[in-house]
Amino acid sequence: MTSLPLPIAFPPRRTRRDLSPAMRAMVLVAGGGLSAMAAVALGRAALGLAPAAPAVREVAVALHLATVLPALPLGLYLLLAHKGGPHHRLLGKVWVMLMLVAALSALGIRHLNHGQFSAIHLFVPLTVIGLWRAVASARSGWIATHRTTMIALYLGGLIGAGAFAFAPARIMGLWLFG
């Protein structure tokens, strides 16, 4: 009687390009939560359930919202999905451009601080430098640096700064909480 040995099934190993389970959970909770809040706020505004926000008519505010809102779920997807392939690279380039336009358009949003820059504008140079560092490290093959920088950009530049957007005096806070 012959028998074939059964292969031992080992759990899949994390590749060096993937996030740890704790980091994946943090990104999912923070990014998913803020994306859901943004979707509810936009839905309330679109249905006329939220108060009017005249500042949305300003070009800088409209451009900023138009780039930040798709960057939230796209960044979440990029951090959680398989990395390194052509799909990841293409969507990563789109995300970098969205973030760059969002950061630069934030320079034109100063009506809440009487025409002056506020503390939230410190995210602008940090985001631009972080984007440059992330792209340069990916092109150089420094994937660990690329990964760390992208996580910091998403959690700090998008989630951290995005949390300020839901303050009561800001547009997203007004739309979400009324």
Question: PLM features: residue spans?
Answer:
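Alpha-helical membrane insertion/targeting regions
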Residues: 2-178
